[in-house]
């Protein structure tokens, strides 16, 4: 068996971290490279030490709760010995206290957290017989239609070296365009699908389009667990998603509403099936090699069935509560009899705290339970158990927040930087992508830079067992990427369209949003909404073109077009645009304005909101991320200028209802209130969600630049 690779210092230079930011008033954070607000109070309280301890331990600390794992105590102890000194003052039993709701988010960890973030067990002294204790449920390989009917075999084991070399040139070197080979509309499901295949030849997956899971080559223990929990019949939508996922195609799926959880159990089933097939194949080949070695046959026998390191599935999630829910699903479908370190996991990832009842339902879902965004945990499957807090190099599945993982990949202490454990990821899952984007998408980009990189060192690696496409740095061509979001944004779209090269193809599922079901038609207010288009040459030029149009056209006529001299709100989605506009108003105009954003201290937030509501502050700047994290109902709004369309269509309705609140209080008249939205043709994706699929192309491409709706 190939032993795991031992890593040393990688000497990676950390990129500029200026964009890794968050809400200082909402969380504990010590900023090192992050931008520091210039005109706002900083909340330097380092607060909850018990939470900090959980952050440390979630990166793999395994020195407690050791019942039933004596065979791995030595390995875990070596891996996490650094934690003993670091946490010796913090790992005392904490007294229980009532749980209260707060939003936890960290963009730059404290020094202690940086210490822990890089602790990855690269000194694995796995018992040579450890693999014999792994998954072996005595199942025979499903041979109903031969190996060619198994998508796992077709995708990972059948592509030849010549084929991969040709595709590598076309896809990675020549950057040939991926043709769209199939578009379908499912009117009854209000859904469309688009299939892209790579240039040249394609991997031909088995033509399985059944609504019965038993028709797919799924391991019996997983299938039985799924049947017990949910039954084997799939809805039409779930069948479409399952077909693409189980055939190892990339998937970009918009699940429309946060209440839709069906897709999660499908990808969890797929991840477990992938792990079990991988481990069982390795075990059976190892047995064959042992038998062959003991025989008198001098002929060489070769099996290439693994990567450089053991982890095969990476699941990125926004919060510990979302991680808790996925782990619960993994346990339910794993078919294991016991779970190691489950109590410890519950203590660190589960919480009963809930947001206030007056918040929107999607907000309560996003921030319920333990909403800390700093974690990274390994999960290992054995014959009868599922082990939580396994060291990364002995894990099968890694669950992490992007920031938690990026702090390991680019730890300030170069000696603690690690990325080899991501070298052999074959299934990448990014769930609740919109929440991750609101935290900081830069961390996702950081992780993507390290996935499937050839390891720096190969200590004790058995190259005779490593697949040639791993050795040849072609793993990216076979890695499956699954991205799930409530609504699509350019950054999320790029994960599959630009950062994935899966030769089995890419499928994008897109909801059909007609004008009747658009967000505009759900507002409930007959208010004047003016959409004004400006010319922009390219997405790169868009920020500059937007700013010039705003200061030259919108701002000079703002007081003239508004029926009121106060109550003017300018909503700005991008923080960088917000800083730009704020600086211009401060240095080049005489506007009496206030500004609130995700960095503003609580005291200033309160003062500014009160001043705006009373009319002392005539104009206010308001950012999308502040609205996401607080969901304020701002009083006193009479005129609303949207510098850009909100990425979340629900925010469009909530912002306009600020004016509805003023109308209800008789502070302004509905006929005199105004909403003006700036957009360019590059905003088509966001525009569709608000005005509908039919209207968006007209607004973006027709001769007229001004459109009014009520």
Curated annotation (Swiss-Prot):
Residues 61-75, 123-143 have a biased composition (Acidic residues). The keyword Cell membrane does not apply. One of its GO terms (molecular function) is rRNA binding. Residues 16-28, 89-109 have a biased composition (Basic and acidic residues). Gene3D superfamilies: P-loop containing nucleotide triphosphate hydrolases (3.40.50.300). Transmembrane segments: none annotated. Keywords: Nucleus, Ribonucleoprotein, Ribosome biogenesis, rRNA processing. GO terms for cellular component: nucleolus; small-subunit processome. It is found in: Nucleus, Nucleolus. Pfam families: Utp25_C, UTP25_NTPase-like. GO terms for biological process: maturation of SSU-rRNA from tricistronic rRNA transcript (SSU-rRNA, 5.8S rRNA, LSU-rRNA). It comes from the Eukaryota. Residues 1-150 are annotated as: Disordered. InterPro entries: P-loop_NTPase, UTP25, UTP25_C, UTP25_NTPase-like. DEAD-box RNA helicase-like protein required for pre-18S rRNA processing, specifically at sites A0, A1, and A2. Component of the ribosomal small subunit (SSU) processome composed of at least 40 protein subunits and snoRNA U3. Belongs to the UTP25 family. This is U3 small nucleolar RNA-associated protein 25. It comes from Candida tropicalis (strain ATCC MYA-3404 / T1). The gene is UTP25.
């Amino acid at each position: 068996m190939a032993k795991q690779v031992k890593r040393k210092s990688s000497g990676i230079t950390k990129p500029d971290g200026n964009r890794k930011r968050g809400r200082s008033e909402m969380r504990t954070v010590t900023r090192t490279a992050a931008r520091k607000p210039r005109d706002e109070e900083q909340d330097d309280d380092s607060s909850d030490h018990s939470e900090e301890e959980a952050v440390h331990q979630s990166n793999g600390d395994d020195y407690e709760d050791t019942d039933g794992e004596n065979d791995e105590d030595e390995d875990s102890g070596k891996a996490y010995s650094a934690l003993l000194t670091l946490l010796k003052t913090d790992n005392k039993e904490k007294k229980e206290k009532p749980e209260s709701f707060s939003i936890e988010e960290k963009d730059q960890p404290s020094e202690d957290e940086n210490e822990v973030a890089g602790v990855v067990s690269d000194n694995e002294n796995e018992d040579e017989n450890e693999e014999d204790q792994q998954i072996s449920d005595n199942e025979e390989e499903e041979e109903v239609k031969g190996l060619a009917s198994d998508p796992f075999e077709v995708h990972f084991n059948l592509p030849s070296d010549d084929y991969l070399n040709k595709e590598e040139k076309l896809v990675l070197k020549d950057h040939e365009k991926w043709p769209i080979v199939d578009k379908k509309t499912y009117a009854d499901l209000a859904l469309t699908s688009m299939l892209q295949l790579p240039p040249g030849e394609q991997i031909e997956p088995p033509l399985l389009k059944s609504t019965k899971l038993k028709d797919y080559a799924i391991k019996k223990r997983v299938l039985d667990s799924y049947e017990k929990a949910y039954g084997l019949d799939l809805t039409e939508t779930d069948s479409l998603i399952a077909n693409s996922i189980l055939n190892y195609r990339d998937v970009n799926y918009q699940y429309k509403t946060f209440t839709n959880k069906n897709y999660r159990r499908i990808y969890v089933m797929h991840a477990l099936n992938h792990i079990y097939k991988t481990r069982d194949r390795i075990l059976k080949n190892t047995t064959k090699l042992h038998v062959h070695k003991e025989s008198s046959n001098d002929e060489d026998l070769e099996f290439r069935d693994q990567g450089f390191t053991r982890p095969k599935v990476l699941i990125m999630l926004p919060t510990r509560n979302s991680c808790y829910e996925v782990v619960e699903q993994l346990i339910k479908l794993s078919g294991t009899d016991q779970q190691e370190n489950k109590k410890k996991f519950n203590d660190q990832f589960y919480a009963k705290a809930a947001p206030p009842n007056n918040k929107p339902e999607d907000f309560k879902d996003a921030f319920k339970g333990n909403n800390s965004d700093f974690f990274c945990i390994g999960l290992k499957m054995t014959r009868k158990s599922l082990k939580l807090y396994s060291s990364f190099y002995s894990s099968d599945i890694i669950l992490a927040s992007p920031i938690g993982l990026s702090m390991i990949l680019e730890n300030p202490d170069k000696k603690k930087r690690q990325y080899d454990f991501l070298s052999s990821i074959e299934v990448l899952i990014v769930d609740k992508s919109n929440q991750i984007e609101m935290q900081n998408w830069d961390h996702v980009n950081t992780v993507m830079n390290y996935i499937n990189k050839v390891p720096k060192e190969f200590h004790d690696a058995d190259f005779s067992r490593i697949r040639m496409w791993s050795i040849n740095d072609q793993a990216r061509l076979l890695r499956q990427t699954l991205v799930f979001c409530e609504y699509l944004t350019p950054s999320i779209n790029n994960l599959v369209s630009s950062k994935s090269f899966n030769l089995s193809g890419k499928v994008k599922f897109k909801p059909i949003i007609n004008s009747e079901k658009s967000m505009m038609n759900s507002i409930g207010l007959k208010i004047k909404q003016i959409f004004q288009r400006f010319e922009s040459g390219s997405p790169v030029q868009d920020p500059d073109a937007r700013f010039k149009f705003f200061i030259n056209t919108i701002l000079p006529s703002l007081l003239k077009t508004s029926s009121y001299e106060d109550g003017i709100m300018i909503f700005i989605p991008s923080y960088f645009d917000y800083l730009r506009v704020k600086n211009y108003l401060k240095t080049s105009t005489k506007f009496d304005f206030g500004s609130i954003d995700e960095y503003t201290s609580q005291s200033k937030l309160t003062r500014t909101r009160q001043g705006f509501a009373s009319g002392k502050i005539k104009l206010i700047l308001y950012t999308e991320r502040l609205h996401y994290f607080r969901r304020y109902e701002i009083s006193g709004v009479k005129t609303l200028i949207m510098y850009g369309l909100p990425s979340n269509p629900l925010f469009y309705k909530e912002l306009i209802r600020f004016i509805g609140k003023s109308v209800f209080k008789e502070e302004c008249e509905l006929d005199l209130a105004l909403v003006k939205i700036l957009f360019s043709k590059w905003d088509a994706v966001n525009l569709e969600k608000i005005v509908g699929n039919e209207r968006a192309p007209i607004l973006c491409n027709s001769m007229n630049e001004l459109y009014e709706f009520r």
